A protein has these predicted regions:
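Short, well-ordered loop/turn and helix-capping segments at boundaries between secondary-structure elements
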Residues: 172, 210-214, 276-279
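Surface-exposed patches in mature extracellular/periplasmic domains of secreted proteins
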Residues: 87-101, 117-121, 215-225, 281-287
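Low-complexity, Gly/Ser/Thr/Pro-rich intrinsically disordered linker/tail segments
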Residues: 246-295
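Bacterial Sec-dependent N-terminal signal peptides
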Residues: 1-22
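Peptidoglycan-targeting cell-wall enzymes and recognition modules
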Residues: 25-80, 89-93, 100-210, 236-240, ...
Length: 295
């Protein structure tokens, strides 16, 4: 019997494991960047709307002195990367597609938010403000030595970078396989995510679209494709925005008697984007009563 493990999405990189034998079919994501691909993102978003939603985003209006790049989180880059994931904002009816877009934007906005309660323009205008985690976190290596297939490199730091704030050596290694066709590039150079806007956005969409057992993909959750099993139901894991939070940061933000303020902002971001796209937020927005996946 064969089991299928997704290394990337949409058959771009697959690993089949059968009777102890492994065969890889790899077509690196970066080789699929063309202008001929299409994405539904442009159906619901324009550059003008992007500027309205993210007026404080990293690098807008100025050139990053380190990377020599203006507007790191540009709408153009987001659309270009979305074309690599043709099922993103493409399955179900318009309401489901807009709900997925709202859920994705809510999570990346909160992951990178520079806002505070009385921030100019309001808290929700400060999404995509940060490129990397705050300085207090960048002293941690985020190297999980139990993940033997993706060994971290001494002196390298796998802290959060990019829209999703990709973290941990095993995530860098898996995404490196999907993007470059090998795990070593980003394990050796995790800082690349802070230098290349395409790579940075791709890391976020790769994470969103890719299931990592025992977690389903955020994409499958929000479009209603993921069906909880009996244990999921017992543990409170139900379809909805809350389960995407569980996938992203369940060990910290879920199953808490009192939600952290950042978790409340994450839920509120989702409602903010749903309102912007004129759709309902659906059921099970919170993960407060959900056990993290794997527990």
């Amino acid at each position: 019997m064969k089991s299928l493990i997704y290394i990337s999405y949409f058959l771009l990189s697959l690993t089949y494991i059968s009777f102890g034998q492994t065969t890889e079919i790899i077509k690196p994501l970066k080789e699929n960047i063309t202008n001929s691909n299409k994405t539904n993102v442009s159906t619901f978003l324009t550059e003008k709307k992007w500027n309205e939603l993210f007026p404080k985003r990293y690098g807008i209006g100025i050139k990053d002195s380190i990377n020599n790049i203006s507007d790191f989180y540009s709408f153009k880059t987001f659309v270009q990367v979305a074309k690599l994931f043709p099922s993103f904002v493409a399955e179900g009816n318009d309401s489901i597609q807009k709900r997925e877009l709202a859920a994705f934007l809510a999570n990346v906005a909160q992951e990178t938010s520079g806002g505070w309660k009385d921030a100019p323009g309001g808290y929700f205008k400060w999404g995509l403000y940060f490129l990397e985690e705050d300085s207090a976190s960048t002293t941690k290596s985020y190297n999980d030595t139990s993940k033997k297939n993706y060994p971290g490199i001494e002196g390298k730091y796998y802290f959060g970078r990019g829209p999703k704030q990709l973290t941990w050596n095993y995530n860098y290694g898996q995404f490196s396989e999907a993007w470059y066709g090998d795990k070593d590039t980003l394990l050796q150079h995790p800082e690349f995510l802070s230098k290349d806007p395409l790579l940075s956005f791709a890391s976020a969409l790769w994470f969103w679209m890719t299931p990592q057992f025992p977690k389903p993909s955020c994409h499958d959750i929000i479009i209603g494709k993921w069906i909880p099993n009996a244990m999921d139901t017992i543990k409170g894991r139900l379809p909805g925005f809350g389960a995407t939070v569980n996938v992203i940061n369940g060990g910290v933000e879920c199953n808490n008697e009192i939600d952290f303020q950042k978790t409340k902002y994450r839920y509120q971001y989702y409602q903010y984007f749903c309102k912007y796209f004129h759709i309902s937020s659906g059921d099970n927005i919170s993960c407060s009563s959900q056990k993290p996946f794997g527990q």
